[in-house]
């Protein structure tokens, strides 16, 4: 499979060839859904907790005698039908992490990249070449590429690129070590450098 590589400085383009096994795979919705759900589940805090009848404060003593008062029997004031009593089916802290093996994770990333390439939403540039921290540089870059909602991807984190773009709505920056399925799906377009593309191919 071939990609057009745009040189932003000279406005000239060349081509780069990559493996079809990585960037031309068939779409597997079930795999992408499973890996994406597992990734999002891993980010859940899972610290929610409520008190049940055994942990809520209050006495375990009978509030009144079993017989003779004319009132209904009551064994404790900590039951769920009492004010300030425990919760019936109380939530407890738990982990939401789901196991996904490396082959599945890499496969899902590859499938997403393939779908982006197929729909012409994956663009390749020679380099971003952001020399100074200025938002207008990123605005000009996006205008040249004709993209708005976009994830900019480099082989290593570019501090100038990150700081220049963080004030722009719907523009994300990441390096290839930080690739995740949610970010790839969450943006309309992905722009990646030529070096990063080759490294992604080697990774997957």
Curated annotation (Swiss-Prot):
Belongs to the universal ribosomal protein uL4 family. This is Large ribosomal subunit protein uL4. Residues 68-77 have a biased composition (Low complexity). Residues 47-58 have a biased composition (Polar residues). It comes from the Bacteria. The keyword RNA-binding applies. NCBIfam families: rplD_bact. Signal peptide: none annotated. SUPFAM superfamilies: Ribosomal protein L4 (SSF52166). One of its GO terms (biological process) is translation. The lineage of its organism: Bacteria, Pseudomonadati, Pseudomonadota, Gammaproteobacteria, Candidatus Pseudothioglobaceae. Part of the 50S ribosomal subunit. Residues 41-77 are annotated as: Disordered. PANTHER family: 50S RIBOSOMAL PROTEIN L4, LARGE RIBOSOMAL SUBUNIT PROTEIN UL4M. The keyword Ribosomal protein applies. InterPro entries: Ribosomal_uL4, Ribosomal_uL4-like, Ribosomal_uL4_dom_sf. One of its GO terms (molecular function) is rRNA binding. One of the primary rRNA binding proteins, this protein initially binds near the 5'-end of the 23S rRNA. It is important during the early stages of 50S assembly. It makes multiple contacts with different domains of the 23S rRNA in the assembled 50S subunit and ribosome. One of its GO terms (cellular component) is ribosome. Keywords: Ribonucleoprotein, Ribosomal protein, RNA-binding, rRNA-binding.
